[in-house]
Amino acid sequence: EAISNMFPDRQKDFVLSINETDLVLIKELTGPADSNKEVYEIAEEIEKKLHDDLNLKCVIGIGTTAKHLRVLADKYKEAQVAIEVGKVFDTEKSIIHYDNLGIGRLIYQLPTTLCEMFLSEVFKKNPIEALDQETLYTINKFFENNLNVSETSRKLFVHRNTLVYRLEKIKKLTGLDLREFDHAIIFKVALMVKKYLNSQNGEY
């Protein structure tokens, strides 16, 4: 009801209750069809309303704009996919747009057998499980800092040579040199694939 009251124009906006926890909002947009700004503002208002009035946390999935009524079902599916993919790859985000899912959307659509095959091909020398938490943390920081050794070592509060040593250790274990762009991409995708497989097995 709190959400329905935010959209009083029943001719243009529709709030549908799917079950006890899920709602669908079909909203007429006034701005350009390809602009996500208006959509994000609406989503933020809904999130704030639920938090302030009902002390509820929510996750909002946004589909792409429907230019015709006949494609509404497809847009609803997109919003659902945005939520599902977001649960795996963007756990910190509460508002997820289908357009911004990136490579996560592609991985989500792959059969698990193909994902497992990819991991075994990438990690021929040692399985990904051979990497300890500190090493994985280092790798993620290295990616966050665009493969910049100096910047990453500064953020990790370690000497540059310490980071280089860790990267060499990763290279020995996996055969991948993360300082090389192509190797870094393969490793990044592999980490995402592993995350996806864990989610399918109920491990987050």
Feature map (PLM): residue ranges:
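Cytosolic nucleotide-utilizing catalytic cores of signal-transduction proteins
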Residues: 1-204
